[in-house]
């Protein structure tokens, strides 16, 4: 058995080996639509390779993060220090979920990665398209993205001229941003309008159960638009499955999207001197524009 397979098995089954990596769901608690769309993923070689680089940080990094945290958001501080790298999906997992292993047919396909961070996940998507556009609120992260060749603009406004000039997009990804957006409902509407109506796919990752706040400098504020997630909140003690069902039923379908695939993956963050990595549970939705709903709305 390959080493990475042995390591993945240890991480999945032995809590003492590190934070548990959970890819499973209780299908009896899911809505029927989620149950039929569920794609079982697992810890693959690329995921294990990322975990292998998570050796914890130094005291100097920890001290630097603490000092910068007095003046900057956590995202900005991580960008300045070049630490806190995230991992959501491997390239093979993205290809499986999107059912795409080659660039968009005919060439010219385009990707919009909203809140792209340092571009680690963008890299998994970029091979599927010819044109990559990214947005980020953090200036240090924008610098990282542009250095990697991912055309980036510092904005939270999807009506930004640069973003709008490149639509429609064949793929739009919104990975762990919805719960940090000030106006998540408006954002979903704008994404639907920018997505190619026939071939476009919307890749959404959300930590569940749901907990929303907006980073403004060193403050964490409540969003001005609240999603109808009562019963699916972290504060409610909701399960992952119940929260996912509520998000689909109360938010995504009313926003004009149709579900294609659903999965669960660990949302990994490179750690610090306390532990090598941290993990949350991400719900992954692959969606497309619901043409019938759009016609009724118009």
Locations of the language-model features?
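Class I SAM-dependent methyltransferase SAM/SAH-binding core
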Residues: 118-160
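Conserved beta-strand signature within the Rossmann-like core of class I S-adenosyl-L-methionine
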Residues: 199-208
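N-terminal accessory regions of S-adenosyl-L-methionine
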Residues: 1-107, 120, 206, 214-298
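Conserved class I S-adenosyl-L-methionine
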Residues: 107-117
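A short glycine-rich, Lys/Arg-flanked "PGG" loop and its adjoining helix->strand segment in the class I
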Residues: 185-198
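A conserved beta-strand element that flanks and buttresses the S-adenosyl-L-methionine
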Residues: 173
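A short His-aromatic
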Residues: 176-180
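Short conserved loop adjoining the S-adenosyl-L-methionine
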Residues: 160-166
């Amino acid at each position: 058995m390959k080493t990475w397979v042995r390591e993945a098995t240890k991480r999945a089954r032995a809590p003492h080996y590190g934070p548990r990596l959970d890819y499973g769901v209780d299908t009896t608690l899911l809505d029927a639509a989620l149950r039929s769309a569920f794609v079982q993923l697992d810890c693959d070689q690329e995921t294990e390779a990322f975990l292998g680089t998570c050796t914890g940080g130094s005291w100097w990094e920890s001290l630097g993060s603490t000092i910068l945290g007095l003046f900057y958001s956590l995202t900005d501080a991580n960008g300045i220090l070049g630490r806190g790298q995230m991992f959501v999906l491997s390239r093979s997992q993205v290809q499986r979920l999107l059912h795409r292993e080659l660039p968009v047919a005919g060439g010219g396909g385009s990707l919009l990665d909203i809140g792209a961070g340092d571009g680690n996940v963008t890299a998994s998507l970029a091979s599927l398209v010819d044109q990559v556009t990214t947005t980020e609120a953090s200036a240090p992260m924008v610098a990282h993205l542009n250095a990697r060749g991912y055309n980036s603009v510092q904005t939270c406004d999807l009506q930004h001229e640069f973003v709008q000039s490149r639509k429609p997009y064949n793929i739009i990804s919104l990975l762990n941003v919805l719960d940090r957006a000030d106006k998540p409902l408006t954002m979903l509407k704008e994404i639907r309008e920018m997505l190619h109506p026939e071939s476009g796919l919307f890749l959404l990752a959300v930590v569940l159960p749901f907990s929303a706040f907006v980073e403004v400098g060193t403050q964490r504020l409540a969003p001005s638009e609240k999603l109808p997630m009562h019963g699916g909140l972290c504060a409610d003690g909701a399960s992952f499955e119940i929260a996912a069902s509520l998000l689909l039923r109360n938010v995504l379908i009313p926003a004009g999207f149709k579900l294609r695939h659903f999965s669960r993956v660990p949302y990994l963050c490179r750690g610090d001197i306390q532990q090598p990595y941290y993990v949350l549970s991400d719900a992954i939705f692959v969606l497309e524009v619901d043409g019938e709903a759009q016609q009724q709305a118009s």
